[in-house]
Amino acid sequence: MSNISRRKFLKTGAAALAGITIAPSTILGMSHGHISPTDKLNLAAVGIGGMGHANINHVKGTENIVALCDVDWKYAKGVFDEFPKAKKYWDYRKMYEEMGKSIDGVIIATADHTHAIITADAMTMGKHVYCQKPLTHSVYESRLLTKLAASTGVVTQMGNQGASDEGTDLVCEWIWNGEIGDVTKVE
């Protein structure tokens, strides 16, 4: 049996743990479902004014914003200035064509009537999507996007401040974990 001091054991263990938390996922193996804290998603955003800007602000500290697209560059100038390294586009199709291989997901906050097609195009490329409400305008569009999500394996979410808020997620976790007991009524 090795004669190691408690202090040396704790010091070595702490160093090993620190190494694991900063090791890239290629070393740890993403195939096992592990994503290293140093890994960031490369995100593109289509429609970056108003809610689009708010959505980008929610992830700008944790993810890489690599491409921005808006038809109104005068209105979008402030957001473009905030992310000088991000490539800028007028047309989302050109952005998808040029950046498709280097983005993991897309934030969509364009005019409502364009949500479904921009989302479908991203999903077809295998990109995860966060889209502002409404995601679609018809049952047909909803069914199409459901089939696309199933066939491509991408994750999609329709944004809604009330349902996408961090506080809402926290309360759901409390309920699911039984931390606040059985919920029988909510007013």
Question: Can you annotate each of these PLM segments?
Answer:
Residues A111-D112, A116-S164, G178:
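Beta-strand-loop-alpha-helix segment that lines the small-molecule cofactor/substrate pocket
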Residues V106-I107:
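N-terminal Rossmann-like NAD(P) cofactor-binding module of classical short-chain dehydrogenase/reductase
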Residues K87-D91:
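Short acidic-hydrophobic, aromatic-tinged amphipathic segments that line or gate anion-handling sites
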Residues G13-F83, G162-D165:
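N-terminal Rossmann-like dinucleotide-binding module
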Residues G47, E179-E187:
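NAD(P)-dependent dehydrogenases' Rossmann-like dinucleotide-binding region
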Residues M1-L17:
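N-terminal secretory signal peptides and thylakoid transit peptides that target proteins
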Residues K94-K101:
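Short amphipathic alpha-helix with an adjacent loop that forms part of the alpha/beta core around
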Residues I65, K85, I103, I180-V183:
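Local beta-strand N-terminus motif with an aromatic residue
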